[in-house]
């Protein structure tokens, strides 16, 4: 998925106001390598989903004219995290649920606060905002994966799931990669982190 504009990114982080997201991207993005040093490789066993899986790649993303295969990185990342917490879902099922329950804007941008409503007794939105090594590292040590908003070299944006760390290198599950690919270094995809979103089990 490539998100084309900062306006689109601001809208994707709907728990924040637009100015806050613009400020975070302009002034608060952090390098993709950093934070606390992890000895060895720490990796949370997050299930892998791919947005271009033929089972759902052609499914329409929410009420938009886009498809999960083209623009479904946020929904696919959320589905990976929800499945990790034991919720029986996948990108197609989560997309259908959010479409039915007002979980998207008209352009197919996700309301992160609506994601836990698929299992309200089990999951809650804990954070949706700017990047922080402390937030990422403390969640990884607690066994919680973190969804990250990242800028891409071509000027687009993408969502991935941070699932671990090796030294100061973050490990990700990438919804645009094959589900059979091992978690790989975030630095191989981007040099910055622009935003974070994570959930917690209740």
Label every model-predicted segment:
Residues 15, 19-25, 45, 79-202:
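Conserved active-site-adjacent core of cysteine acyl-enzyme catalytic domains
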């Amino acid at each position: 998925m490539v998100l084309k504009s900062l306006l689109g990114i601001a809208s994707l982080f709907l728990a924040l106001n637009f100015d806050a997201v613009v400020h975070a991207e302009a002034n608060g993005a952090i390098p993709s390598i950093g934070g606390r040093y992890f000895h060895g490789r720490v990796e949370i066993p997050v299930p892998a989903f791919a947005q271009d899986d033929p089972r759902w790649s052609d499914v329409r993303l929410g009420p938009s004219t886009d498809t999960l295969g083209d623009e479904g990185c946020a929904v696919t990342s959320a589905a990976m995290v929800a499945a990790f917490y034991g919720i029986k879902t996948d990108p197609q099922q989560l997309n259908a649920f959010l479409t039915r329950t007002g979980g998207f804007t008209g352009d197919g941008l996700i309301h992160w606060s609506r994601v836990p409503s698929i299992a309200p007794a089990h999951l809650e939105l804990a954070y949706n905002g700017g990047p922080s090594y402390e937030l990422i590292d403390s969640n990884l040590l607690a066994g919680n994966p973190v969804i990250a908003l990242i800028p891409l070299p071509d000027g687009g944006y993408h969502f991935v799931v941070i699932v671990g760390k090796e030294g100061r290198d973050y490990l990700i599950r990438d919804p645009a990669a094959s589900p059979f690919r091992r978690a790989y270094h975030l630095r191989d995809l981007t040099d910055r982190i622009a935003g974070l979103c994570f959930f917690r089990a209740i």
